[in-house]
Amino acid sequence: MAAESLPFTLETVSSWELEAWYEDLQEVLSSDEIGGTYISSPGNEEEESKTFTTLDPASLAWLTEEPGPTEVTRTSQSPRSPDSSQSSMAQEEEEEEQGRTRKRKQSGQCPARPGKQRMKEKEQENERKVAQLAEENERLKQEIERLTREVETTRRALIDRMVSLHQA
């Protein structure tokens, strides 16, 4: 198994990024507590016939590598008793997940691919920093050239003055 790079750097992480990671973790953990979760892997046809509930697409997004929308299908529904309290609890959980998704959409993050979105934002931020540092570098070069010219003129003036004092 090949080692994968971390989806983040070891630098300081912004609070909104930490909050998004925390929400993603909560979604994954809560889906694990609900029932046996099943993520189909290639060449696993015999296990696909088992009864599992599937994860919310937002919680699966960080697991997928290929671009495009995440497709999650329900292979079969877990049996529910006619007890209304269980069905109302399931509805409440679904509403909570939808609320979290809406909250994330409102904060400007894409729930379908939060890891890739963060990486893209980080890359854009790094490009802005590079451009900003290049501008600062150019400004500093010009300042160095200006100061070098100023030192040269001051040095010449000082030499001329010393020469004129010795001649007098």
From Swiss-Prot:
Subcellular location as annotated: Cytoplasm; Nucleus
GO terms, biological process: anterior/posterior axis specification; apoptotic process; artery development; blood vessel maturation; calcium ion import; cell redox homeostasis; diaphragm contraction; endoplasmic reticulum unfolded protein response
Modified residues (Phosphoserine): 14-15, 30-31, 78, 81
Residues covered by region (Interaction with TRIB3): 10-18
Domain bZIP: 98-161
PROSITE patterns associated with the record: BZIP
Regions that span the bilayer: none
Domain of life: Eukaryota
Biased composition (Basic and acidic residues): 118-139
Post-translational modification: Ubiquitinated, leading to its degradation by the proteasome.
Region listing for Disordered, in residue ranges: 34-139
Region entry N-terminal, spans: 10-26
Biased composition (Low complexity): 73-88
InterPro entries reported in the protein's UniProt record: bZIP, bZIP_sf, DNA_damage_induc_transcript_3
GO cellular component terms attached to this protein's record: CHOP-ATF3 complex; CHOP-ATF4 complex; CHOP-C/EBP complex; cytoplasm; late endosome; nucleoplasm; nucleus; protein-DNA complex
Residue numbers spanned by region Leucine-zipper: 133-147
Domain remark from Swiss-Prot or TrEMBL: The N-terminal region is necessary for its proteasomal degradation, transcriptional activity and interaction with EP300/P300.
Function (record text): Multifunctional transcription factor in endoplasmic reticulum (ER) stress response. Plays an essential role in the response to a wide variety of cell stresses and induces cell cycle arrest and apoptosis in response to ER stress. Plays a dual role both as an inhibitor of CCAAT/enhancer-binding protein (C/EBP) function and as an activator of other genes. Acts as a dominant-negative regulator of C/EBP-induced transcription: dimerizes with members of the C/EBP family, impairs their association with C/EBP binding sites in the promoter regions, and inhibits the expression of C/EBP regulated genes.
PANTHER family (alphabetical): DNA DAMAGE-INDUCIBLE TRANSCRIPT 3 DDIT3, DNA DAMAGE-INDUCIBLE TRANSCRIPT 3 PROTEIN
Subunit structure: Heterodimer. Interacts with TCF7L2/TCF4, EP300/P300, HDAC5 and HDAC6. Interacts with TRIB3 which blocks its association with EP300/P300. Interacts with FOXO3, and CEBPB. Interacts with ATF4. Interacts with HDAC1.
Record-given protein name: DNA damage-inducible transcript 3 protein
Species annotation: Mus musculus (Mouse)
Phylogenetic lineage: Eukaryota, Metazoa, Chordata, Craniata, Vertebrata
Gene behind this protein: Ddit3
